[in-house]
Amino acid sequence: MEKVTGIGGLFFRAEDPAKLASWYEQHLGVTQVPTDYDQSPWIQQTGPTVFAPFEQETDYFGDPSKQWMINFRVDDLDRMVAQLRRHGIEVSVDETHYPNGRFARLRDPEGNPIELWEAAK
């Protein structure tokens, strides 16, 4: 069976796409969409990606009106959280150390939920 080889993009609606793209670049290092074919898109590091549809009634994303949540892998959760907090971004750290790693939550300027994941080493 032929399979997909990975996620090639994440596309979503935004009230102010340019402003939101700048926020992701400034605070999380996700480069913006190239404006021509000579530029490279954001290249993520090799690692696991979880593809998980959730029940409609889930509270995992926080706000029930949000239909998606993105999870970003990070090398050092504590350093990333400190960096975000220095910029005035509210981050909630789950103090539980799970077998698969540690997690933190925040929201982008438009209220979209973001999860940060430091995989277990």
Residue map of PLM features:
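Vicinal oxygen chelate
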Residues: M1-G9, V81-K121
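Core segments of cupin and vicinal oxygen chelate
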Residues: E2-T5, F11-V50
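Residues that flank catalytic or metal-binding motifs in active/ligand-binding sites
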Residues: G6, G47-T49, K66-W68, R102
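Acetyl-CoA-dependent GNAT
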Residues: T35, F54-E57, L116-K121
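Short beta-strand micro-motifs in enzyme catalytic cores
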Residues: S40-W42, W68, N100-A104
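Short, charged/polar surface micro-motifs in flexible loops or helix N-caps
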Residues: T46-V50, E57-T58, D75-R79
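Short, charged/polar, Gly/Pro-enriched secondary-structure boundary elements
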Residues: P48-A52, G111-I114
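Mid-chain, well-packed structural core segment of small domains
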Residues: D63-L84
